[in-house]
């Protein structure tokens, strides 16, 4: 009787493992398809932004910038951590602030009043 019980448990475990492997395969196939769709969408967005940049002769969205004039008309140069440089003189010598925190980038104009103030885009 014990042998039959062990055999049935083994079959059940094998069946459960097989179903789990099928589920894992289906999920991995779905994730691969999702990654491909995401890549295609991001390529389309990049192409559109590059075309916009060519039309305006300006930097596309999320490019590094120094001022509003290098960004496109509907973008502005945003420096989220512009005050970080002022903190550097107060930090000990061993503490370094990464350059990524000092980086400014072209961002979309928003409703909060953050707009491109460059003279060449004013009408």
Curated annotation (Swiss-Prot):
It comes from Oxyopes takobius. Residues 55-122 form the Oxytoxin-type inhibitor cystine knot (ICK) domain. Belongs to the spiderine family. Spiderine subfamily. The lineage of its organism: Eukaryota, Metazoa, Ecdysozoa, Arthropoda, Chelicerata. Expressed by the venom gland. InterPro entries: OXYTX_ICK. Residues 1-16 form the signal peptide. One of its GO terms (molecular function) is toxin activity. The primary structure of the mature peptide is identical to that of omega-oxotoxin-Ol1a from Oxyopes lineatus (AC P0C8M0). This is Omega-oxotoxin-Ot1a. The keyword Secreted applies.
